[in-house]
Amino acid sequence: MPRPVTVIDSNVTNAVHQVMDAMQAPVYFETYIIKGKNMNHLTWEVVDSIRKNKVCLNGRVNNSLCGGARKELDLFASLVDCFNLNGQPSRHENVDIVVIRENTEGEYAGREHEVVPGVIESFQVTMTKFWSDRIAKYAFEYAHFSKRKKVTAVHNNGKYEKLADAFFLESCQEVAKMYPNITYNEIASRETRAIRRHSNSKSLWAIIANIASGVAGGSFGDDYAIFEQVGSVGNHKNPVALLFSSVMMLRHLLLPLFADRLKTAVTRVISEGKCGNSNTTTQEVVDSVIANLD
């Protein structure tokens, strides 16, 4: 039976439609166009569709678009898949990292208000034990089911939020004991040269995702999931990032054979150098991906 998916339309979502049709993937889309005054947030109509379908593919590059939905749908885990692509130059080699962070507390809570006209106060919500435990369990569960051998907790070494860091690490250490087959370690910002170059920033998780060339990602909760291209590689013409996010979506929908076919086809097209040319049209990339489907 076809799986329903809510789609937030963009210039590249039609590419996903075409490739899914070519694969005869058992999914169908409910498409919504976000424009005008709704560009920075999801309408209730879209949120209701996500509640019904459980899965959303966000074609928009605007990172703030789904901010409200993360809280409304309790999408507590952000996941960014970082990996090298043959045919694409990269500062780092042999990258295969999944970056997971808490999506609804701490610096990503997005709590702010206007104290008096012209003065905005922005503040963070300290990590609670419940949310610290939950994101730690999510990371180890993901590592377990994806057959990854190591989980690394990245923290600020108490430089900015000493109590919050201690809280987070305590949760990770407790959860790690339940997964003896997974190696657990901790890295402070001062121990990583790449992070130290950005030591004035608190967003270590975002920095790592960008340095490691995050391609595809999503936000996940117990009941719902939104898949989207990573903001740093979002492109209004090139559909590759959204196609890789669609690979993640297909795995989430328990359609691994279709996910493997799509990932193989996109990887082939990239290795052949058919995506790096600025003169290449979206349709040419789509046609090449379809031609490479097994």
Curated annotation (Swiss-Prot):
SMART domains: Iso_dh
Coiled coil: none
The family this protein is said to belong to: Belongs to the isocitrate and isopropylmalate dehydrogenases family.
Known role: Performs an essential role in the oxidative function of the citric acid cycle.
PANTHER family (UniProt xref): DECARBOXYLATING DEHYDROGENASES-ISOCITRATE, ISOPROPYLMALATE, TARTRATE (PTHR11835), ISOCITRATE DEHYDROGENASE [NAD] REGULATORY SUBUNIT 1, MITOCHONDRIAL-RELATED (PTHR11835:SF80)
Name of this chain's protein: Putative isocitrate dehydrogenase [NAD] subunit-like 4
Native source species: Arabidopsis thaliana
The gene coding this protein: IDH4
